């Protein structure tokens, strides 16, 4: 008997899971995918090239829309799960209850937002989703990137490609630690500064004005 499988999340892991399930046994599950982003599933790794203008939004979807229709997968984009009832095996989306036999959480991670005064200003935003990229690109002028990890470095480099002033703030003494040693971190800093990116290391942020 076909079982009802609901996947909460429409990111890269969820999409790959659904693809494999359909490939292995298309009749085993009636699959529903629920994702709170209004866009089709996309390659999140490509957000930095998108921010830099090297890619377009049309180039980063993981699957075409017709794939879901062709394989009988129900895709509910732009919808958030408000409640999960484990006992009755159902979940609530707004006022609608959706039953399931098997449930998969594939929601991914969330960026850490430091609890700083001024963090809620409209010009302050994370760098995690396609909507974040659209919001960042909509605001002209100098940019400050908080965090010198992989995404922070990529975001700073991408923003600099647009010609604006970019400052990268990092609380550690070396960029992209622990992926880099002291020599590599310093070489990376020099490369960024050669591109015109100001790097401020070993700093702490008290507030955003």
Q: For each predicted feature, which ranges?
A:
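Glycine/Thr-rich phosphate-binding loops of Rossmann-like dinucleotide-binding domains
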Residues: 113-114, 153-154, 177
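FAD-binding core/adjacent interface of flavoenzyme oxidoreductases
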Residues: 1-6, 61-144
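Conserved beta-strand termini and adjacent loop/short-helix elements that scaffold enzyme active sites
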Residues: 34, 78-80, 127, 150, ...
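Beta1-alpha1 glycine-rich phosphate/pyrophosphate-binding loop at the start
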Residues: 2-74, 158-179, 183
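A Rossmann-like FAD-binding core segment of flavoenzymes
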Residues: 75-92, 98, 162-209
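Glycine-rich Rossmann-fold phosphate-binding loop(s) that bind the pyrophosphate
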Residues: 9-12, 128, 146-151
């Amino acid at each position: 008997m076909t079982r009802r499988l609901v996947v909460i999340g429409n990111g890269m892991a969820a999409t790959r899971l659904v693809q494999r399930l359909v490939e292995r046994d298309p009749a085993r599950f009636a699959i529903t995918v629920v994702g709170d982003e209004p866009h089709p599933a996309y390659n999140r790794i490509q957000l930095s090239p998108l921010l830099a203008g090297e890619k377009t939004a049309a180039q980063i979807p993981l699957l075409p829309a017709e794939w879901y229709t062709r394989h009988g997968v129900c895709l509910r984009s732009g919808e958030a799960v408000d409640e999960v009832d484990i006992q009755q095996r159902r979940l609530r989306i707004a006022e609608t209850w959706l039953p399931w036999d098997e449930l998969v959480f594939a929601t991914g991670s969330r960026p850490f937002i430091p609890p700083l005064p001024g963090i809620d200003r409209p010009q302050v935003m994370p760098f995690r989703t396609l909507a974040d990229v659209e919001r960042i690109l909509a605001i002209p002028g100098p940019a400050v990137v908080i965090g010198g990890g992989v995404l922070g470095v990529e975001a700073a480099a991408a923003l600099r490609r647009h010609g604006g002033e970019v400052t990268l703030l990092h609380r550690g003494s070396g960029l992209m630690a622990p992926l880099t040693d002291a020599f590599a971190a310093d070489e990376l800093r020099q490369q960024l500064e050669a591109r015109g990116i100001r790097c401020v290391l070993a700093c702490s942020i008290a507030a955003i004005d």
